[in-house]
Amino acid sequence: MELCDDTLLRELAKTKNGFTVEKIKEILLQLNNVFKKMHENKIVHRDIKLNNILIKYLNKEKTKFKVLLSDYGISNQINSLSKNLKTYAGTQIIMAPEILSNSKKYGDKCDLWSLGIIIFKLKTKKHPYSGRKDNEILDDIKEKGQSVLDVIKDDKLKDLLSKLLVINPDERISWDEYFNHPFFK
């Protein structure tokens, strides 16, 4: 494993109002290479969060960097017989609704939800939803819905988030749709 300089969470804490849209895009484009490999190998991370995204600076000015995803401890592979996972795993505040609700089965779209939460936090420095227990977080998600996106001013970023933060995983954007979203063009 490579030696990294910091986590994305600590870098975010150093900003006044969150990252610019351009910086978010730069980070995501690098992470997308990791996500594509995970998707191709049917790996679900289940704990994508800012503390698990590492930064390695490539110059002293910290203008060039490499982004890595860490902590695959609770990741799992979806096999061809069962396209779903069943284990309750992850960090509560970032967990997809289908995991929080103890749904009997969930798939790789749970990582897309977590990614939406992370992107929102990178832009605003805040979590879109709150609560200390699963049912409190779920209630907040249902109550606020996508109205939390009103603070996002960039149209393409807002559209991407509106497709990631969809309660019903069957209606949530797919990985292929995510990779091809206009935000990345």
Over which residues does each language-model region extend?
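Conserved short submotifs of the Hanks-type protein kinase catalytic core
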Residues: 2-7
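Activation segment signature within eukaryotic-like protein kinase domains
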Residues: 27-28
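Catalytic-loop of the protein kinase fold
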Residues: 39-56
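Conserved activation segment of eukaryotic-like protein kinases, specifically the C-terminal portion
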Residues: 85-99
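Conserved end of the kinase activation segment
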Residues: 98-109
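Terminal C-lobe "cap" of eukaryotic-type protein kinase domains
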Residues: 166-185
